[in-house]
Curated annotation (Swiss-Prot):
One of its GO terms (cellular component) is plasma membrane. Disulfide bonds: none annotated. Belongs to the UPF0316 family. This is UPF0316 protein BH0621. It holds the Pfam family DUF2179. The chain crosses the membrane at residues 9-29, 41-61, 67-87. InterPro entries: DUF2179, DUF5698, UPF0316. Keywords: Cell membrane, Membrane, Transmembrane, Transmembrane helix. It comes from the Bacteria.
Length: 179
C-alpha cells in the first residue's frame, strides 16, 4: 500500500515538473514572438500556454499539503527558464547590428565580409593610437556567431559590440527581407 502512494506521489511530482517546464518554455517563446511583433503566433502560443499553466497550478493547489509538489513546481519553473533561453537561442529571430573597430586600419576587411554576404558600411575612425577601421554590419541573428568568428579571424583584437535594431528602412537588406 505504501509503495502505491510513493509511486503515485513520484508520478505527481514528475507531471508537475514537466508541466511547468513546458509552461515556462511556452511563456518565453510567446514573449519572443510578442517582442518580434508576430502577434498571431504569440496569441496561438498564449492559448496553449494558459491551458498548461492552469493544469500545473491546479495540480499544486489541489495538493497543497504535499510540499514536494510545490518544490517540483518551483524546480520546473527554473528548468523552464533555462529551456526557454535555449529555445530562444535556437530560434534566433530578428537581426543585429554589429559595430566593429579594428586594432589596425585594414581596408580589405569590409570587402572580405561583403564577399561572405554581409552588408558592411565602413569608414576611417581615429582612436588614441591612430587610425582604425570602423564598420557597421547588419546581419540575421542566426548568422551572428559566424560573423563574430569571421571578424575574430580577420582581426583577433577587434572591438565588437552589437545591438538589436527595432526597425530599419532602405539599404542592402531591404531587398532580401520578407516581412
Amino acid at each position: 500500500m505504501v509503495s502505491f502512494f510513493m509511486e503515485h506521489a513520484l508520478t505527481m511530482i514528475l507531471i508537475i515538473l514537466i508541466i511547468n517546464v513546458v509552461y515556462v518554455t511556452l511563456f518565453t517563446v510567446r514573449m519572443i514572438f510578442t517582442l518580434k511583433n508576430q502577434r498571431y503566433l504569440a496569441a496561438t502560443v498564449s492559448m496553449i500556454e494558459i491551458i498548461v499553466y492552469v493544469l500545473g497550478l491546479s495540480l499544486v493547489l489541489d495538493n497543497l499539503d504535499r510540499i514536494e509538489n510545490l518544490i517540483a513546481y518551483a524546480v520546473g519553473y527554473g528548468i523552464g527558464v533555462i529551456t526557454g533561453m535555449k529555445v530562444e537561442e535556437k530560434l534566433a529571430l530578428g537581426y543585429i547590428t554589429v559595430n566593429v573597430i579594428t586594432k589596425e586600419y585594414e581596408p580589405d576587411i569590409p570587402n572580405t565580409l561583403r564577399d561572405k554576404g554581409y552588408g558592411v558600411t565602413n569608414w576611417v575612425a581615429y582612436g588614441r593610437e591612430g587610425e582604425r577601421l570602423m564598420m557597421e554590419i547588419l546581419t540575421s541573428r542566426k548568422s551572428e556567431a559566424d560573423l563574430y568568428a569571421t571578424i575574430k579571424k580577420l582581426d583577433p583584437k577587434a572591438f565588437i559590440i552589437s545591438h538589436e535594431p527595432k526597425t530599419f528602412f532602405g539599404g542592402f537588406w531591404v531587398k532580401g527581407i520578407r516581412r
